[in-house]
């Protein structure tokens, strides 16, 4: 498909299959299931594409921070993150008459709490450098505004 050396580009490959109401997504070593683009039922246990998308963004950024801190020999005692996505025009997805605007994620916010014993300057430098090394963050910010706040907690 592409003739690019892996040192310059890594081709990630995935597969999906529809099985009844379930869409089975295959990763290299596992599979996950989803049932819809977005699920507006807070009680439902069925995962949606937006659920996986949101937690993948958050998980990718936390993973990048963890790896970057480890490379710099900076300890993270604990880390927790929260993500909010602003889903515009959701009624279009529900087929509500009179609503036909394209559904889109307008923007998002992430708040990450990190317990460490770093100075504020070093903490800020490490977190910003971690974002610069994050595939997911660097891709997402081209699609919609994503505000990320880091807070150091003791």
Predicted regions and their residues:
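Extended beta-strand/beta-hairpin segments
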Residues: 1-55, 66-154
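Alpha-helical metal-binding/catalytic segments enriched in His/Glu/Asp
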Residues: 60-61
